[in-house]
């Protein structure tokens, strides 16, 4: 019999019609409405930041794989997705060199040093954002004026809605229509709720994701908002709830495979998000930290709802 070299890659080992490239391509397509909205709201500086983050992420992955003499994986588009998601988590006008540092952390340290796609312990983009938030807090919390591209909706400048809530300036909150169309302060991908919802529908229709995690996450945010005395609509439409719930909590590598595991995963993320938002600490937003914490305990959640193989556990007495 002919000897063959077999390479066992990271699980799950599931055969299906969709390749990594097609899945990542669908994610990029789903993000396009948010990209367009970010340019309409913040101008060409948003597009520049997005292009640089995508290019830097692809370059870092290519160089790392080449230096370590591994098969290059830039064609699977996962590096492009990471770069674009990181850009979506940055404010317009964020220094380019700092964004490139964030791409290095996301691609090289979080993704490639742990073995590449499917082996990372946490979502690379969200970890890169947290690193930048800690290292460059001032730049990560500087918000430019949001331009109005919809007649009848005024432009909004200054703090984000969550920062206003933290300061007790509830009367200064943008109207719901501002939140829906993204005409308010925030990161590039956090502002326009309608664009993110369009992306969500596309991913569900294409069967790239199931609605379980986003729906349970948003529902948990709503319930926790009522318990803690906040307006649920405002809590859902502000910050990174929709961006994180749709595009980052659903990451294949760092989310549970079982249906009940997904429910607990999203439930935990929603509770942690609202507890951080309600705390008296310096961070008005809790989505990033909630996702990272749930990513870390994800392997344990895969045991919830998992079916036992036939013959395991012994006979009933």
What are these regions (language model features)?
Residues 1-58, 311-317:
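N-terminal signal-anchor module of multipass membrane proteins
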Residues 37, 82-91, 105, 197-203, ...:
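Generic transmembrane alpha-helix motif of multi-pass integral membrane proteins
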Residues 78-79, 84-152:
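Membrane-interface helix-loop-helix junctions at boundaries between adjacent transmembrane segments
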Residues 121, 125, 234-241, 262-265, ...:
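Loop-to-transmembrane alpha-helix initiation sites
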Residues 43-56, 93-102, 179, 183-192, ...:
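Structural signature of hydrophobic alpha-helical transmembrane segments
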Residues 59-71, 107-118, 196-206, 246-255:
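C-terminal ends of transmembrane helices
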Residues 26-34, 49-61, 78-83, 87, ...:
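Alpha-helical transmembrane segments in multi-pass membrane proteins
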Residues 119-197:
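Long hydrophobic alpha-helical segments that form multi-pass transmembrane helix bundles
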């Amino acid at each position: 019999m002919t000897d063959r070299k077999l390479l066992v890659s990271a699980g799950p080992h599931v055969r299906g019609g969709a390749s990594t490239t097609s899945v990542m391509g669908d994610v990029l397509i789903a993000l396009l409405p948010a990209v367009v909205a970010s340019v309409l709201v913040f101008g060409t500086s948003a597009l520049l930041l997005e292009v640089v983050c995508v290019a830097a992420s692809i370059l870092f992955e290519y160089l790392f794989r080449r230096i370590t003499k591994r098969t290059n994986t830039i064609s699977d588009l996962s590096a492009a997705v990471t770069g674009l998601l990181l850009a979506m988590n940055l404010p317009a006008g964020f220094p380019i060199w700092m964004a490139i540092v964030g791409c290095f952390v996301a691609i090289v340290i979080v993704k490639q040093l742990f073995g590449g796609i499917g082996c990372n312990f946490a979502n690379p983009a969200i970890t890169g954002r947290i690193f930048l938030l800690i290292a460059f807090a001032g730049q990560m919390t500087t918000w430019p004026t949001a331009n109005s591209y919809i007649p009848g909706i005024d432009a909004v400048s200054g703090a984000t809605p969550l920062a206003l809530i933290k300061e007790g300036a509830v009367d200064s909150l943008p109207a719901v229509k501002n939140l829906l169309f993204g005409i308010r302060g925030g990161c590039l991908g956090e502002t326009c709720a309608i664009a993110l919802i369009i992306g969500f529908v596309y991913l569900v229709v294409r069967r790239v994701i199931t609605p379980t995690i986003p729906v349970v996450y948003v529902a948990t945010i709503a319930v926790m908002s009522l318990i803690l005395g906040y307006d649920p609509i405002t809590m859902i439409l502000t910050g990174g709830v929709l961006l994180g719930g749709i595009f980052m909590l659903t990451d294949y590598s760092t989310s549970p495979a079982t249906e009940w595991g997904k429910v607990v995963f999203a439930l935990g993320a929603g509770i942690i998000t609202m507890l951080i938002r309600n705390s008296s600490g310096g961070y008005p937003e809790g989505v990033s930290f909630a996702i990272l914490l749930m990513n870390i305990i994800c392997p344990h959640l895969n045991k919830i709802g998992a079916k036992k193989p036939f013959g395991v556990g012994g006979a009933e007495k």
